[in-house]
Amino acid sequence: MLYLVLSKLVWIVLLAIVLILCVAYLTYAERKVIAATQLRVGPDLVGPFGLLQPIADAIKVLLKEIIIPNAASPKLFLFAPVIIFVLALVGWAVIPFGTSEIDGVEVPTVIANVNLGVMYLLGVAALEVYGTIIAGWASKSSYSFLGALRSASQMISYEIVIAPVVMTVILLTGSLNLAEIVVIKHSLPYWVDILMLPMTFIFFVSILAETNRHPFDLPEAEAELVSGYNVEYSSIPFALFFLGEYANMILSSSIMATLFLGGWYPPINWWGLSIVPGFIWFILKIVFVLFCFLIVRATLPRYRYDQLMRLCWKVFLPVTLLWIVVIGGLVAFNIV
């Protein structure tokens, strides 16, 4: 029992360290991708090819003074970024990275293989809103509060879209366990993946909105709200918001890879691809989704707020509800 607890603790610490490093170099990759689309070089002065730029940025931010506005609520002001950062980490507890063989039995490589993994992730995503609202309210700034209100309405609206999208996957697989979903979905015929393409697209757009990423980064629209709900933050609290945003990007990409892209299985059932370890395939799929995040930021203009809400309530929600009926009918008549 003690060995099991210690092994899980080691897993958690290693995962947290790796995730923070991934966040650091995701910012580097983002700047390089955007620079390439604009025919610029990007960061290339600090270290070879600019590879030490994230470390320089981290040192610069951490050496800044922590400033708390006079009118702010100090405890809530400092608690809000901790909420966002911690919630970005705890979601990884149920993400399966692959499979490993123990006593001749294949078991998923995951910190906590719970049967309600999907519900757990939806619950964690719902709690993210509280960190944003607390940050905006505790700052006692009009810009912060308006950014927090925008973010809350945006995140809640798109959670309502994400839930029925995930419901279509649950109907297809008959399970809430993420590892079982990957295995069952892999056994389904290929035409099911084609049928699920609209849901895959809607899920991707929804996680863009859920993570407040471009073109839906309206809570931090520079021309209107300066920096949004985190405008009063500096130093370590600001860094926690920054880490939370990019860690949520990676978490959302891993969820998409698990539910829609086949998890740790190769994209095509060909013997040459099956030689590659499943963990590598899972990482490559996450990198692909993250690259889509970056390309979207580099190429698309920002949506207006009314366009964002109209897309959610008048386009995505009706389509997802229709798809639930379609998938439910296919399952009910044993076509899938």
Curated annotation (Swiss-Prot):
Residues spanning the membrane: 9-29, 77-97, 116-136, 156-176, 188-208, 236-256, 275-295, 315-335
Subcellular location: Cell inner membrane
Reactions catalysed according to its record: a quinone + NADH + 5 H(+)(in) = a quinol + NAD(+) + 4 H(+)(out)
GO terms for MF: NADH dehydrogenase activity; oxidoreductase activity, acting on NAD(P)H, quinone or similar compound as acceptor; quinone binding
GO biological process: aerobic respiration
Domain of life: Bacteria
InterPro entries noted in UniProt: NADH_UbQ_OxRdtase_su1/FPO (IPR001694), NADH_UbQ_OxRdtase_su1_CS (IPR018086)
Record keyword Hydrolase present: no
Enzyme class: translocase
GO cellular component: plasma membrane
Keywords from the UniProt entry: Cell inner membrane, Cell membrane, Membrane, NAD, Quinone, Translocase, Transmembrane, Transmembrane helix, Ubiquinone
Membrane topology of this protein: Multi-pass membrane protein
Free-text function comment from the UniProt entry: NDH-1 shuttles electrons from NADH, via FMN and iron-sulfur (Fe-S) centers, to quinones in the respiratory chain. The immediate electron acceptor for the enzyme in this species is believed to be ubiquinone. Couples the redox reaction to proton translocation (for every two electrons transferred, four hydrogen ions are translocated across the cytoplasmic membrane), and thus conserves the redox energy in a proton gradient. This subunit may bind ubiquinone.
Quaternary data: NDH-1 is composed of 14 different subunits. Subunits NuoA, H, J, K, L, M, N constitute the membrane sector of the complex.
Protein family (similarity comment): Belongs to the complex I subunit 1 family.
Protein's name in the database: NADH-quinone oxidoreductase subunit H
Gene this protein is translated from: nuoH
